[in-house]
Amino acid sequence: MTVRLQLALDFVDLHRALKAAEEGVRGGVDVLEVGTPLLKAEGLDAVRKLRQAFPRIDIVCDGKTMDAGRLELETAAKAGATVGTVLGLASDSTIEECCEAGRNYGIKVLVDLLGCPDPAARARFAASVGAWAVNVHCPIDEQVRGGDPLEALRAVRAAVSIPVTVAGGITARSAPAVVAAGADIVIVGGAITKARDAETAARSILEAMRSGVAGDSEMAERISSEDELRRILTEVSTPNISDAMHRAPCWSGLHALVPGIRIAGPAVTVRTAPGDWAKPVEAIDHCKPGDVLVIDSGGVPPAIWGELASNSARNRGLAGVVILGAVRDTANIRTLGLPVYARTICPNAGEPKGFGEIGVSLRVDGISCQPGDWVVADDDGVAVLPRARSVEIANRAMYCLEAENRVRSEINDGGQTLAEVVDLYKWEKQVISQEDPE
């Protein structure tokens, strides 16, 4: 069986899905998938419209059926799908019913092993009741925590002889590995649908699949450990991070003394009184290269930081300094090039009395910063990533950036407005009326 490329259209707007499908098919995509978000947003009309646009191509209706298998497979088949999906977590009877309905209505059944405790065992059951194929699936919410499908793919491939599909953050870089592990169909979503040029991205992935040589991708590699955090966090912005954290607030209203620079590093925290610069300066000695010094001095003058402290911090190799308080000597600090972000600027400092603490929990404007949390600062503000979730948040922020890149290309290429591209009017929240019915 020649390895095939399936494009997962995980949009919520049909017009965007159709555009990506057109580009993908031009790039050599073999199978189109109506992704679950698209199916929920647009219904089976998405299958019908794709069938009209692509009458000769296989179409997967990714309904992820858990119940009512006969009805869901019947309607998918009548809408034009050639493959319907049922979750491996569904009951045995539901999977069996889907397979019987598939035989009756002429639609192939793909059992998605997403979340199955023993994927290989469930794959064997699926094959025994007549499923056409099984899907080894590492979902987005696991990918952002460093998961990948390779281990499960090898186990499932060894367990069954029916076709095995694979999904889970696959790009031109990783496609050869999943083919080598036994995938018959490689399912790709974001690496194509978020690419500025989906046609070129699809072609690159196909070449990598069939040549066995990893290719290039504009999608960033997802990270799996804290060791890789700095690389990805200096590529995303604080707005991307806020979006990734469900629009979480960041520290704003700070002056970036060296504009145009983005910094990222683990926090060394200080709390001090306004104007008391003893603990902030002493904290430099506690820092390692790449750390970000975060100082809470109440957000008001007098200054607790200046040029001499900045010289020390630069020599120590700090990534930067965030001052929730006042700074002075700003012209000289700019000359040094040390990234410093401060809430206010004033010429007068206080005395170094030592009324403060180093390595403490900070909470400013409702935002918590613990020692070791990751801090990202740029011209827009300062974001704090809890250390325990920093890898996940960084990956989600990159996902947000890549999605924005695709929207930008659609705006520029098609001459549309943002509201038109994302169908903003349709997605305004509908609320319960407070008016009494007449």
Feature-to-residue mapping (PLM):
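Active-site/ligand-binding-proximal alpha/beta "capping" segment
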Residues: 132-187, 191-193, 363-398
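Short, small-residue-enriched loops and turns at beta-alpha junctions
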Residues: 11-16, 36-42, 65-68, 90-93, ...
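C-terminal helical cap(s) of enzyme catalytic domains, especially alpha/beta-barrels
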Residues: 98, 179-181, 190-218, 397
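Conserved anion-binding
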Residues: 5, 68-153, 158-159
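Alpha-helix-loop-beta-strand connector modules within alpha/beta enzyme cores
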Residues: 43-64, 98-115, 147-170, 204-218, ...
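Conserved N-terminal beta1-alpha1 strand-loop-helix module at the mouth
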Residues: 1-70, 119, 126-129, 235-240, ...
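Feature captures the catalytic cores and cofactor-binding loops of soluble hydro-lyases/lyases
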Residues: 217-371, 384-438
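Hydrophobic faces of well-ordered beta-strands that scaffold small-molecule active sites
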Residues: 3-9, 32-34, 59-63, 84-86, ...
